[in-house]
Structures are given as structure tokens and as C-alpha cells.
């Protein structure tokens, strides 16, 4: 099996160029200068229509730290649900070590230890966790 060549891009045009250059999966976001934010609904839809490879969507309402307010968690939850409804392959989220979003029912903050992170969704669990390696 060939290794997955995932490329992080911040626009539809960059996604097309990455696929043409050999990417087998895309991480789609905007504003990489601030670490990446959630791309627009229109960009996500266009990628679904045109990209021949799966892509992950960055879910992040703003740049800066990874400590989010309750309102920001609700925004993130809505973005995740929209991605699910559209049929997006997956989403990418980043959180501080101690505050994790529960995606079941209402938005809740859960205290979890640094290495015991499990995300539960209505129909099951996330199947991948991407770490920085520390």
C-alpha cells in the first residue's frame, strides 16, 4: 500500500494544484498564517464537487490559542455538523490539553488527561487522531 500524501492547503485552487502534484489526501483550511481556520462553506462544496481525492476540513473559528469559549465550541459543532451533512471525509480539530469538545447532545467541556483523548460522535468514535508527536 502506498503511503498517504496529505497536503495542507488554504484554497480550492491550491487543492487542485496539490492533487495534480500527487497529493492523495487534502487538509483544507484557510488563513494558514494564523495556523489555519475553517474554510468557507462554498469552498468546501466546490472541493466536494471537483476533487478526486478525500479531504479533511479544519474546524477552527479563529487563529490564536486553542482555548475556546462556549460560543466558539457551538460554532465549531455547527461547522462539524455541516461537514457531516455535506459528506466530507473528515474534520481536523485542535484543542488545549484540558478542554475537549463533546459532540454528543449539547456542547460540553470535558476534563481529560493529555493522553486519554477519545472523541465520541452520535454514531461512533473518530477513527484517527493526529498529534504533533510530543
Language-model segment annotations:
Residues 10-21, 67-80, 125-134:
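Catalytic cores of alpha/beta
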Residues 36-63, 102-124:
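Alpha-helix-loop-beta-strand connector modules within alpha/beta enzyme cores
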Residues 10-12, 31, 58-64, 94-98, ...:
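Active-site beta-loop-alpha junctions enriched in small/polar residues
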Residues 24-37, 81-99, 134:
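Glycine-rich phosphate-binding active-site loops on the catalytic face of alpha/beta enzymes
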Residues 3-7, 26-28, 55-59, 91-93, ...:
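Hydrophobic faces of well-ordered beta-strands that scaffold small-molecule active sites
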Residues 35-43, 68-78, 100-101:
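Alpha-helix N-cap and loop-to-helix initiation/capping positions
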Residues 2-24, 31, 38:
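N-terminal pre-domain/capping segments
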